């Protein structure tokens, strides 16, 4: 009787241990599932954090690029403002120079015109500016007691011999040839400056040089 009870008690203990093992295995399985789920969630969180970090780094890179671009633009605008200011100053200085040059040119032109008027009155000579620079055309008036004598002239500006002959003829009539030559030269200069061709014709350039040579050479 005692032996039967002992076996029954043993079986109960074995059964209890078995059931406990079953519960432990069940709990272990649940725990493993929870650990796996936790690891899966943790992995998802890590991946999400990595993606977020990549986005943050990308945004930081964009922000840095935008900041550098903005700094470059600010620097460029500063340089541009300096260049604009420098250009304004240069333009003002240029306007002042042009104004001074125009004023000096007007003064010089007034002096020349006054000189031409004086020489024209002194020599009694009128030079047709429309004919210049190709031709030296005009008239010299010799004042007389009874009547005035008109001496018209119309020569090719390159006709050095004709100009010399005219100078000799005027000199024989007691005309101040030196002043006459100065008058023609001044009128020639004023006319050519007024027309101011960008590329002076070859004939005009030659005619001016010949007249200058003729006017500076002594007359007999």
Curated annotation (Swiss-Prot):
Protein name: Kinetochore protein Spc25
GO biological process assignments: cell division; meiotic metaphase chromosome alignment; meiotic spindle organization; mitotic metaphase chromosome alignment
Record flagged with keyword Phosphoprotein: no
Oligomeric and partner information: Component of the Ndc80 complex, which is composed of Ndc80, Nuf2 and Spc25.
Subcellular location: Nucleus; Chromosome, Centromere, Kinetochore
Family label: Belongs to the SPC25 family.
Name of encoding gene: Spc25
Keywords, in A-Z order: Cell cycle, Cell division, Centromere, Chromosome, Coiled coil, Kinetochore, Meiosis, Mitosis, Nucleus
GO CC, any one term: Ndc80 complex
Keyword Cell cycle included in the entry's annotation: yes
Species whose genome carries this gene: Drosophila erecta
Coiled coil: 41-119
Function as written in the Swiss-Prot or TrEMBL entry: Acts as a component of the essential kinetochore-associated Ndc80 complex, which is required for chromosome segregation and spindle checkpoint activity during meiosis and mitosis. Required for kinetochore integrity and the organization of stable microtubule binding sites in the outer plate of the kinetochore. Participates in SAC signaling that responds specifically to disruptions in spindle microtubule dynamics. The NDC80 complex synergistically enhances the affinity of the SKA1 complex for microtubules and may allow the NDC80 complex to track depolymerizing microtubules.
């Amino acid at each position: 009787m005692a032996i039967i009870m002992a076996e029954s008690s043993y079986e109960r203990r074995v059964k209890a241990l078995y059931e406990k093992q079953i519960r432990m295995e069940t709990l272990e399985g649940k725990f493993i599932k929870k650990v796996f789920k936790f690891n899966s969630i943790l992995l998802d969180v890590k991946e999400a954090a990595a993606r977020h970090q990549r986005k943050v780094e990308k945004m930081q890179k964009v922000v840095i690029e935008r900041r550098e671009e903005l700094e470059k633009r600010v620097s460029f605008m500063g340089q541009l403002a300096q260049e604009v200011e420098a250009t304004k100053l240069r333009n003002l200085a240029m306007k002042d120079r042009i104004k001074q040059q125009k004023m000096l040119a007007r003064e010089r032109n007034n002096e020349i015109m006054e000189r031409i008027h004086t020489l024209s009155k002194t020599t009694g000579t009128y030079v047709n500016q429309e004919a210049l620079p190709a031709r030296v055309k005009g008239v010299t008036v010799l004042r007389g007691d009874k009547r005035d004598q008109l001496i018209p002239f119309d020569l090719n500006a390159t006709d050095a011999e004709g100009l010399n002959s005219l100078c000799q003829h005027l000199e024989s009539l007691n005309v101040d040839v030196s002043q006459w030559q100065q008058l023609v030269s001044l009128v020639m200069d004023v006319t050519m400056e007024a027309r101011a061709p960008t590329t002076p014709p070859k004939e005009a350039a030659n005619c001016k040089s010949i007249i200058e040579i003729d006017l500076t050479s002594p007359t007999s």
